[in-house]
Amino acid sequence: MFVSRLAASGLLLLSLLALSLDGKPLPQRQPHHIQPMEQKWLAPDAPPLEQKWLAPDAPPLEQKWLAPAAPPLEQKWLAPDAPPMEQKWLAPDAPPMEQKWLAPDAPPMEQKWLAPDAPPMEQKWLAPDAAPLEQKWLAPDAPPMEQKWLAPDAPPMEQKWQPQIPSLMEQRQLSSGGTTALRQELSPRAEAASGPAVVGGGGGGGGGSKAALALPKPPKAKGAAAATSRLMRDLRPDGKQASQKWGRLVDHDHDHHHHHHPGSSVGGGGGGGGGGARRLKGLAKKGVAKGCFGLKLDRIGSMSGLGC
């Protein structure tokens, strides 16, 4: 009984407290309770590291510095008595974006500008008393993108250019000289290959049987002459035109040789008694062979007796 009354009184007190606090705003902090590190203003008695304002005769976004009592490393402006390492301006006779350097007493390694007689993007160097390895420009007689080197006294390993290439006419002259030398080397070999065939055809006066046995020798000379003709035909592209002209002359000489000298065809086997006649018939059956440069050959295996 006593406990229930005590609990009911406690609940009544809590409800009254809740009704009294309902609808009231929370207490706000007063301005005098703000800490010093959270307060920023432009008062004259502020610490130098926390005080910033603008000059009275300069735009707000262009000039900023600290109080006069601030150290020089934290103070920046364009005054004429500023340190040379922190002072930068442009020359009076140069565009603002192309020419920048430090004070007149700055070291040469920190002073850069462009030459007055060169484009801004192609020629750059340092002060006149700078080291030669730090000075670069282009040659006056070369394109800007192909030839670059340093000062005139620079080592040759830092100078690059393109070597000279022989022209197309010189290459053709070299190739034609090699072809002429090869042709002169092959011509004596062709004459040596056709020589034994000429000698073997005229010395058969002993008898018909020996002349008949000596008949299979000309095909060897003909094969050597044909092999030489293929090599020479590759070297001379106008072989077909020359072969047609020489073919007509050889046919004319061959007919003239048989009509005007009837004894020459039988003279090879003169003492043999009919051996030369069989030899002439064998050559007539086979026909006239072809040899040097695709031309026709006579019975002794040479072109009208001249050889290849």
UniProtKB/Swiss-Prot annotation:
Propeptide residue intervals: 24-38, 42-50, 54-62, 66-74, 78-86, 90-98, 102-110, 114-122, 126-134, 138-146, 150-158, 162-249, 278-286
Compositionally skewed regions (Polar residues) per UniProt: 172-182
Pfam families from the UniProt entry: ANP
Name of the protein in its database record: Snake venom metalloprotease inhibitor 02D01
Signal peptide feature range: 1-23
Region Disordered, annotated ranges: 172-228, 252-279
Keywords: Cleavage on pair of basic residues, Disulfide bond, Hypotensive agent, Metalloenzyme inhibitor, Metalloprotease inhibitor, Protease inhibitor, Pyrrolidone carboxylic acid, Repeat, Secreted, Signal, Toxin, Vasoactive, Vasodilator
Organism: Echis ocellatus (Ocellated saw-scaled viper)
Residue ranges, compositional bias (Gly residues): 198-209, 265-277
Function (record text): pEKW and poly-His-poly-Gly peptides may serve as metalloproteinase inhibitors during glandular storage. Their inhibition may be instantly disengaged, by dilution or physiochemical change, when venom is injected into tissue of the prey.
Cellular compartment(s): Secreted
Biased composition (Low complexity): 210-227
Keyword Amino-acid biosynthesis: no
GO molecular function, one term: hormone activity
Annotated tissue distribution: Expressed by the venom gland.
Family according to the record: In the C-terminal section; belongs to the natriuretic peptide family. In the central section; belongs to the pHpG family.
Modified residues (Pyrrolidone carboxylic acid): Q39, Q51, Q63, Q75, Q87, Q99, Q111, Q123, Q135, Q147, Q159
